Amino acid sequence: MRLRDAAKVIRSKNAGPTEITVDLMFNDAAGFARALEAPSLSAGVIAQRYGVQSVRIIPYPAANAIKIVIPRATTAGSPGDTDVSGAQQHRPLLDVEI
């Protein structure tokens, strides 16, 4: 099952000048657990997908949600920043199989 089909919400946003967050929200605990346990959503695999050294995975079981914190390649708003609001950075995860 693709992440886009399993999650109710997949969004990314600016989290300060040096980080972007991706929020994954699921309808129920089963979908949340499936995503949290999926090897394709491990910190190492996501870091590789985004071309960064590491990412942080923060689960929120009470909300059936997962937050992924990704370091920005460049400071928000600086020359070379192509997405100052970070709103388009969730795209690489949409078709991930979980």
Model-derived regions, located:
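Helix-rich interaction surfaces within compact, conserved domain-sized segments
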Residues: 48-98
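Acidic, aromatic-enriched beta-alpha/helix-loop junctions
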Residues: 30-60
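Short, charged/polar N-terminal "headpieces" of proteins
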Residues: 1-18
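Residues at beta-strand starts and edge strands
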Residues: 18-20, 64
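A broadly conserved detector of short glycine/acidic/proline-rich loop/turn motifs that flank catalytic sites
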Residues: 7, 30, 72-74
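Lumenal/extracellular ectodomains and adaptor appendage modules
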Residues: 10, 20, 40-43, 80-84, ...
